[in-house]
Amino acid sequence: MANDYLFTSESVSEGHPDKVADQISDAILDAILAQDKYSRVAAETLCNTGLVVLAGEITTTANIDYIQIARDTIKRIGYDNTDYGIDYRGCAVLVAYDKQSPDIAQGVDRAHDNNLDQGAGDQGLMFGYACDETPELMPLPIHLSHRLVERQANLRRDGRLPWLRPDAKSQVTVRYVDGKPHSIDTVVLSTQHAPEIDLPALREAVIEEVIKPTLPADLIKGDIKFLVNPTGRFVIGGPQGDCGLTGRKIIVDTYGGAAPHGGGAFSGKDPSKVDRSAAYAGRYVAKNIVAAGLASRALIQVSYAIGVAEPTSVMVNTFGTGRVSDETITKLVREHFDLRPKGIIQMLDLLRPIYEKTAAYGHFGREEPEFSWEAADKALALAEAAGVEPAVQVA
């Protein structure tokens, strides 16, 4: 890669239609796990103008009011007015859940005991990543993109910018020099708004109140290109503007394109699905490698076969930044992390109802108490085993 280059990532707000769907799916998952932690859940959601469709496969002993959960989630996000295209009080909610296929269940239904040979819920490959660009050990472009739409939501909720509406998108382009963030080049922010606000006033307020307070001062060098609502009017948004579906923001959910993605979405899936649990484990492993000072960048790939507990492969790539060889780090990963599906569930305590919070503003790089995969609690052991000094700054 060139020594001087631009890299871009994007995020979307909790009111984006795909994120509405993700949050409904994970709210349903949480409600089920709160009653029956051994449930099998694959909850998919579609939302459009005035309509929510809940479908998928659920096997559980829990007694859940799915319709009320969908309405409560839509209300929490802020769609509480028919002018917004969907209103939690009046939208139609259709429910079409089936049970998990017994052909799938036979390989994974060993969860009620301590048998660590519970098989993976599907085949697939998953990635984890960490780097030293931020205290959270995340790539800077996706980190800033998340913080922008998160701030947009906070300003909407507290009434400081009362004309903001729930749907928004952000995009941040960072200039890198010698592989390190050098400066912010471009910030794009498109936000849904009330019809009475004029565009010049909106753009000024968004730049001054949303964007500038979010950007690191040391990366503001020269003129930054601010593109706020570049198409102009953005009154129609949310599920009215676009049909929302669970699992369509997998790059937003992870590393903003800075690392590969195995293709499996997260939301609505219980942790027997390695699409979710192994991706969380990959982040946990990668973050501990970087926190331990073994490398400044770490990419983990892990893969599985359906019904088989042991991963079919584990790979570590530190992109030449490792203080010991990638082969040595891979060996340490196998020694210090149990990457069998049941081992991951136990290691990260994943049978808790913790998932709705993950469904907006990124699954990774957020220091929430529930996000066990963000802990750097194995960094010291890894550093000692490798014979290196652990990294000093870990969020």
From Swiss-Prot:
Keywords: ATP-binding, Cytoplasm, Magnesium, Metal-binding, Nucleotide-binding, One-carbon metabolism, Potassium, Transferase. One of its GO terms (cellular component) is cytoplasm. Mg(2+) binds at D18. InterPro entries: ADOMET_SYNTHASE_CS (IPR022631), S-AdoMet_synt_C (IPR022630), S-AdoMet_synt_central (IPR022629), S-AdoMet_synt_N (IPR022628), S-AdoMet_synthetase (IPR002133), S-AdoMet_synthetase_sfam (IPR022636). It catalyses: L-methionine + ATP + H2O = S-adenosyl-L-methionine + phosphate + diphosphate. The keyword Lipid biosynthesis does not apply. Pathway: Amino-acid biosynthesis; S-adenosyl-L-methionine biosynthesis; S-adenosyl-L-methionine from L-methionine: step 1/1. Its EC number is 2.5.1.6. GO terms for molecular function: ATP binding; magnesium ion binding; methionine adenosyltransferase activity. L-methionine binds at E57, Q100, D242, K273. Its main location: cytoplasm. Binds 2 divalent ions per subunit. Binds 1 potassium ion per subunit. It is found in: Cytoplasm. ATP binds at H16, D167, A168, K169, R233, F234, D242, R248, K249, A265, K269. Homotetramer; dimer of dimers. This is S-adenosylmethionine synthase. The gene is metK.
